């Protein structure tokens, strides 16, 4: 398996807000087997990718907690293949969308676009902690409508809601995330409008194309 940690560009974008409806019980589907052409990447493998990659890396993101965990596999930025934008934590959005994740930044400019990937050996999954607000990313399985299964950095601890399997496709040089809560792959909602445009949701049964594919950039410094 070769590394897919890439180099960066420049500039950022802004954001606003929206209010999703609550309701609907979360799905507890067992995560599917690795899709054809994709393989799971564990914590040690991801750490080796970060250390061995020869290409340029993202600039350091300010605001990372000093109490990095021993099982921290690295700090990364997620770039959507669908729209070419980096994922940011909307920490200034009002409830119930505070901390929603959107692929809306043209560049990694700081903590907004940074996420610590924490490997959990017992479950063979990752928890993603936002550097913007020091909260873990959760899948909102109880939200309804277009906001169901949206990703928000809002948790102080990591359980099933906050755990993901990381996949890599060597032929495509792309990454994908699968929620442990509902077994769905994370997709970027390119067709949404308003303040939830480009939001990330765990809603796809499989990796069908660029909607579910991401590039991974290591943040160093």
Q: Which residues does each PLM region occupy?
A:
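Lectin-like carbohydrate-binding module/patch detector with strong preference for beta-trefoil
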Residues: 27-221
């Amino acid at each position: 398996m070769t590394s897919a940690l890439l180099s960066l560009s420049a500039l950022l974008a802004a954001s606003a807000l929206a209010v999703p409806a609550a309701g609907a019980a979360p799905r507890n589907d067992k995560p599917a087997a690795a899709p054809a052409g994709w393989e799971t990447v564990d914590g040690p493998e991801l750490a080796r990718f970060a250390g061995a990659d020869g290409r340029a890396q993202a600039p350091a993101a300010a605001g990372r907690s000093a109490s990095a965990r021993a099982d921290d596999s690295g700090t990364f930025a997620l770039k959507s293949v669908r729209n070419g934008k980096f994922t940011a934590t909307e920490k200034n959005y009002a409830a119930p969308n505070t901390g929603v994740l959107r692929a809306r930044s043209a560049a990694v400019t700081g903590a907004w676009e940074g996420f610590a990937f924490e490997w959990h050996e017992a479950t063979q999954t990752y928890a993603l902690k936002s550097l913007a607000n020091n909260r873990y990313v959760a899948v909102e399985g109880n939200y309804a409508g277009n906001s169901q299964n949206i990703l928000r950095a809002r948790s102080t601890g990591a359980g099933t809601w906050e755990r993901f399997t990381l996949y890599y496709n060597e032929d495509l040089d792309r990454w994908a995330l699968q929620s442990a809560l509902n077994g769905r792959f994370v997709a970027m909602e390119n067709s949404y409008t308003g303040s939830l445009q480009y939001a990330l949701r765990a809603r796809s049964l499989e990796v069908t194309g660029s909607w579910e594919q991401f590039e991974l950039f290591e943040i160093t410094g």
